[in-house]
């Protein structure tokens, strides 16, 4: 068996990636979220596959087909709620994974980091098109508002929007193509995940101390396979509690009303995991400016490897940048809260302040604190 594992062309790759992989001996539970994201992706693909067997992507029957899944399909309600809440768990793990990368300076592995950001954007696109599929009120109006943003692009904007819609409004053609995108994108994500892992295993994993750990490595199996299994157990417990006891707590009640183009909901808002970006979008009065700020709110993560001037790796021994980091986290929570509030005073002003603070922390405060800490080390 050992000879097969180490010599077989296919098993050899698996062996070098998950069994005999030399791993730093001191990586903490914050490093569990990569495997949890892999687990989330598998859950989403499997539940999505079973939902796709019963779902119809036609405007007249889409809403009814989701109701049919919940009422008539064996455990359809469970599959649907596991899929909906699985997306929330996916994004919770994703945010923690990115947050850990920033805290411990994992962005110095720039290839892995940049592929990770592309993965983040692809996951956001998948979640957006997926939210449109049940064809409730918030699905329809969310799709209308977000796709309409593309009309802000000079010259080609209006044509581009009509091309994506497949007509002059969000309708049957839009829903059909969104179902197709939602089906294909998870497999594209899976391909990117493999590239992400490929780049990670080229350099080896980062660790909490930020020091080179080549002198102190242990095999991935059994130490970290057991650790990951514990994390997966916690994840599945949380997901089952959400799906069985609070299935609609993270959803929008408006989505239980069938889509009606003649009736606009009072507050159009996306799912909770997009609210921080939505708040940044709304805080800029200009349409094109808002769209650019929305894009930059994610793409700014690519600036971390470029803006890093610190002599130390990670924030574990850097109290000034550490404080700024936690202010950034608090700021993101404020943005998430503002994104779900109506567009009125004082929420608009809080959103504008939080948006400016978000960009200022990453582009100004963190690089400045890096320089200050470098000078303190010299003293």
UniProtKB/Swiss-Prot annotation:
Binds 2 heme b groups non-covalently. Its main location: mitochondrion. Heme b b562 binds at residues 83, 182. Its cofactor is heme b. GO terms for cellular component: mitochondrial inner membrane; respiratory chain complex III. PROSITE patterns: CYTB_CTER (PS51003), CYTB_NTER (PS51002). Pfam families: Cytochrom_B_C, Cytochrome_B. Heme b b566 binds at residues 97, 196. The keyword Mitochondrion applies. Gene3D superfamilies: Cytochrome Bc1 Complex, Chain C (1.20.810.10). SUPFAM superfamilies: a domain/subunit of cytochrome bc1 complex (Ubiquinol-cytochrome c reductase), Transmembrane di-heme cytochromes. It is a multi-pass membrane protein. Keywords: Electron transport, Heme, Iron, Membrane, Metal-binding, Mitochondrion, Mitochondrion inner membrane, Respiratory chain, Transmembrane, Transmembrane helix, Transport, Ubiquinone. A ubiquinone binds at residue 201. Heme 1 (or BL or b562) is low-potential and absorbs at about 562 nm, and heme 2 (or BH or b566) is high-potential and absorbs at about 566 nm. Component of the ubiquinol-cytochrome c reductase complex (complex III or cytochrome b-c1 complex) that is part of the mitochondrial respiratory chain. The b-c1 complex mediates electron transfer from ubiquinol to cytochrome c. Contributes to the generation of a proton gradient across the mitochondrial membrane that is then used for ATP synthesis. The cytochrome bc1 complex contains 11 subunits: 3 respiratory subunits (MT-CYB, CYC1 and UQCRFS1), 2 core proteins (UQCRC1 and UQCRC2) and 6 low-molecular weight proteins (UQCRH/QCR6, UQCRB/QCR7, UQCRQ/QCR8, UQCR10/QCR9, UQCR11/QCR10 and a cleavage product of UQCRFS1). This cytochrome bc1 complex then forms a dimer. Belongs to the cytochrome b family. This is Cytochrome b. It comes from Akodon molinae (Molina's grass mouse). The lineage of its organism: Eukaryota, Metazoa, Chordata, Craniata, Vertebrata. The gene is MT-CYB.
């Amino acid at each position: 068996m050992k000879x097969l594992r180490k010599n077989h062309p296919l098993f050899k790759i698996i062996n070098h990636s998950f069994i005999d992989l030399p791993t730093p001996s001191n990586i903490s539970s914050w490093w569990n979220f990569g495997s949890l994201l892999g687990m989330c992706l598998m859950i989403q693909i499997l539940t999505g596959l079973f939902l796709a067997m019963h779902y119809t992507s036609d405007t007249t029957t889409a809403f009814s087909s989701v109701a049919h899944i919940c009422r008539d399909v064996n455990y359809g309600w469970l599959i649907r709620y596991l899929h909906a809440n699985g997306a929330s768990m996916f994004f919770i793990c994703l945010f923690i994974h990115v947050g850990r990368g920033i805290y411990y300076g994992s962005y110095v592995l720039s290839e892995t980091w940049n592929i990770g950001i592309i993965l983040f954007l692809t996951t956001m696109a998948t979640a957006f098109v997926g939210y449109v599929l049940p064809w409730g009120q918030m699905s329809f109006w969310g799709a209308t508002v977000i796709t309409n943003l593309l009309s802000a692009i000079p010259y080609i904007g209006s044509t581009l929007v009509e091309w994506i819609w497949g007509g002059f409004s969000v309708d049957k053609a839009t829903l059909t193509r969104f179902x197709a995108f939602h089906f294909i994108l998870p497999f594209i994500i899976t391909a990117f995940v493999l590239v992400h892992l490929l780049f990670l295993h080229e350099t080896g994993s980062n660790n909490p101390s930020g020091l080179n750990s080549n002198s102190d490595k242990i095999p991935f199996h059994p130490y970290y396979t057991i650790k990951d299994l514990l994390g997966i157990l916690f994840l599945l417990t949380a997901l089952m509690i959400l799906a069985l006891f609070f299935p609609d707590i993270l959803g929008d009640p408006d989505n239980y009303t069938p889509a009606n183009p003649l009736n606009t909901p009072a507050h159009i808002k996306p799912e909770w995991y997009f609210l921080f970006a939505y708040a940044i979008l709304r805080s800029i009065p200009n349409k094109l400016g808002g769209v650019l700020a929305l894009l930059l709110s994610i793409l700014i993560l690519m600036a971390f490897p470029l803006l890093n001037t610190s002599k130390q790796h990670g924030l574990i021994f850097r109290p000034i940048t550490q404080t700024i980091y936690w202010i950034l986290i608090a700021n993101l929570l404020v943005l998430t809260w503002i994104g779900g509030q109506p567009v009125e005073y004082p929420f608009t002003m809080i959103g504008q302040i939080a948006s400016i603070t978000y960009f200022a922390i990453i582009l100004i405060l963190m690089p400045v604190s890096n320089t200050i800490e470098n000078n303190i080390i010299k003293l």
